[in-house]
Amino acid sequence: MLKTFDTPIHIIGGGLAGCEASWQIAQSGIPVILHEMRPQKKSDAHKTDKLAELVCSNSFRCDDSSTNAVGLLHAEMRLAKSLIMKAADANKVPAGSALAVDRDGFSKTVTSALENHSLITIKREEVQEISKDWKHVIVATGPLTSPAFAQELKAITGIKALSFFDAIAPIIHTDSIDMNICWYQSRYDKIGPEGTGKDYLNCPLNKEQYETFVEALKNAEKTEFRDFEKTPYFDGCLPIEIMAERGLETLRHGPMKPMGLTNAYNPTVKPYAVVQLRQDNKLGTLYNMVGFQTKLKYGEQVRIFRMIPGLEKAEFARLGGLHRNTYLNSPIILDQTLRLKQKKQLRFAGQITGCEGYVESAAIGLLAGRFAAAEYHHNCPCLPPQTTAFGALLNHITGGHIIDEEAERPSFQPMNINFGLFPPISPIRYSGKRLPSKEKKLAKKQAITARALNDCIQWLADKESKSSCLSKNT
């Protein structure tokens, strides 16, 4: 029987991350006080007072753990005895290969489990500031953090650490870019911090290609803002389709300007316009489209962005978007166990850390809960291997993203789990004839997921191992 303790861990926010963190902590014998502002104070998106309410879709996306990154994350969470996954499995509805749930049944299951846990106290109140008497705190307030608490977070983290508008550009798998068309070069061959003068991939367009591209953007189907997202555009974060509507030459003097770039494959012909791709993770497996934040519908993004020379066969790890959000510049202000570097009794979990999606949010809540419980028990939190979905996602949030500390706005952007976040797999050797491209990609995914599940099982079984632990002074 687990020993119980007197001092509680306070968790602010009863969404997926806060609920999962509460469960993981309580299951380790530690009392939890879960603070949820609803129904005392409503948000613009929630409709009920239930915990873990699914505000948008009822889908947890693909449940295939052998060939899909989010399905792999499902499997790892089940191995870690996730409450969120248990509730999802108990409330499944038909959805093909996806895991979709009865949203009301799901929320009721989570709420009931937490209300009936002897070590969890739920306080229905808005937290406007973090009490100095609270020794252990996890903040999991999500993208719709209340204005009052957002001000508290600004004061704690620093104004540059918090963003309130998601400017998301598409991200592309590097191995799907045509390197016979695109070339590496920084504008004017400028060498920045840790740069080489060849830090961008460049996609050239001639005049006809550029004008066709602009026309396609202007005529594309666009997603409208939801009522609670309505915020004026600001010039530093204009959707690319809005720029296209401002005039034929606007993009060519903005994110698609060709100045300072020479086509390595055709140096005597100056590109009329250039789309630049910037490395998005330290592994170099992902590149983002610079300045291409957008509200185009997903299908339109794929169709139109594949018109760009070199991206005809582009595979997208994430498509673009622009919507209201509240998230931290996590790689700068959080340590590897999700603690605030300058105030280590405070952890963050869920979407506010810079992950996207129901499952990702719950997974980071699970990790934050386990890290907090280990620390509470005076044990060293053990990091999941980066080869696991847990570790890949955590690494993106706390260190895998390339940081531009001189940028006016944080360069860090929220991310779903995807195979581009994982370390490359060792080359797969096949006996006999060469595999077709599709079969080779499938085999690669299967190898990554098999490695991940094996490493996750080992991590869960050996989580107190010194070899996978951080120093207590980290």
Swiss-Prot record:
Listed cofactors: FAD
EC id: 2.1.1.74
InterPro entries in UniProt: FAD/NAD-bd_sf, MnmG-rel, MnmG-rel_CS, MnmG_N, TrmFO
Keywords: Cytoplasm, FAD, Flavoprotein, Methyltransferase, NAD, NADP, Transferase, tRNA processing
GO cellular component, one term: cytosol
Compartmental location: Cytoplasm
SUPFAM superfamilies, A to Z: FAD/NAD(P)-binding domain
One example GO MF annotation: flavin adenine dinucleotide binding
GO-annotated biological processes: tRNA methylation; tRNA wobble uridine modification
Chief location of this protein within or outside the cell: cytoplasm
Amino-acid positions noted as binding FAD in the UniProt annotation, renumbered to this chain: G13, G14, G15, L16, A17, G18
Family the entry assigns: Belongs to the MnmG family. TrmFO subfamily.
Function noted in UniProt: Catalyzes the folate-dependent formation of 5-methyl-uridine at position 54 (M-5-U54) in all tRNAs.
This protein's name: Methylenetetrahydrofolate--tRNA-(uracil-5-)-methyltransferase TrmFO
